[in-house]
């Protein structure tokens, strides 16, 4: 499959981007970012674990699947700085990644359905597929950075909480889901960069990141209406003379 066709690398990056955005969405909604485990020494009582998410909080006894306390207004009263930052960082990261997916889709559709004979009237509306993929790679990298940094901060903030209070705090599996999704965004960006750097060595302006006419556009002459403003001297008009 040539670089001028819909390449397997671009399809793989698109699917990887979708999976990464889905992982970020799941990590954003999961109520399993931090656990607060309260241990009792009374044999007649059970240990209590408080699961803290970005939007809700749930407290349940050990061995129970039902929440003893389910706080749906937790998102407005979050008192932990790392979770408050994640409330803004993860939706922003998903928004950037979805913009990158849209650019990837535009680039692939333009590559798959473009005509081999360009329409001169639509010359200013042509889409540069390589440029779309290049910008999408940059956006994927930005989205991964926005989501990865605060997710790793949760790990170090747990250490701070355990030192400040008691060693009862631990991070939960939503941290792993988000870090893995951010890694998927970085891998998507890397695939697009490798694809672009491999294909741009072709001697064609098609691989320039900015808009440029395809090579076949230069073989077309301008319509006569664009030349009609030339003077009679510039236009080669045959002159017929009559001899007596």
From Swiss-Prot:
Sequence ranges on the Extracellular membrane side: 32-87, 157-174
Q: Which GO terms describe its cellular component?
A: bicellular tight junction; lateral plasma membrane; plasma membrane
Provide the species name.
Homo sapiens
Q: Which residues carry this modification: Phosphoserine?
A: 228, 231
List residues traversing the bilayer: 11-31, 88-108, 136-156, 175-195
Does the keyword field hold Transmembrane helix? yes
According to UniProt, the name of this protein is Claudin-12
Q: Which residues lie on this side of the membrane: Cytoplasmic?
A: 1-10, 109-135, 196-244
Provide the gene name from the record: CLDN12
Q: Cellular location of this protein?
A: Cell junction, Tight junction; Cell membrane
């Amino acid at each position: 499959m040539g670089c001028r066709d819909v390449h397997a690398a671009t399809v793989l990056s698109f699917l990887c981007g979708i999976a990464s955005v889905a992982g970020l969405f799941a990590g954003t909604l999961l109520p399993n970012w931090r656990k607060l485990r309260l241990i009792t020494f009374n044999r007649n009582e059970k240990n209590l674990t408080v699961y803290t998410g970005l939007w809700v909080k749930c407290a349940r006894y050990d061995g129970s699947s039902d929440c003893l306390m389910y706080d749906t207004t937790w998102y407005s009263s979050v008192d932990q700085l790392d979770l408050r930052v994640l409330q803004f960082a993860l939706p922003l990261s998903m928004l950037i990644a979805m913009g990158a997916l849209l650019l990837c889709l535009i680039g692939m559709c333009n590559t798959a359905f473009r005509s081999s004979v360009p329409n001169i009237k639509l010359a200013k509306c042509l889409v540069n597929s390589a440029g779309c993929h290049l910008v999408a790679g940059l956006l994927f990298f930005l989205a991964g950075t926005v989501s990865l940094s605060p997710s790793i901060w949760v790990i170090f903030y747990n250490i701070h909480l355990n030192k400040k209070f008691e060693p009862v705090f631990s991070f939960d599996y939503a941290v792993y889901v988000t870090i893995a999704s951010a890694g998927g965004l970085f891998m998507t960006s890397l695939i697009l960069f490798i694809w672009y750097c491999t294909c741009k060595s072709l001697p064609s302006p098609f691989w320039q990141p900015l808009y440029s006419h395809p090579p076949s556009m230069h073989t077309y002459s301008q319509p006569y209406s664009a030349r009609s403003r030339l003077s009679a001297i510039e236009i080669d008009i045959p002159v017929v003379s009559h001899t007596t």
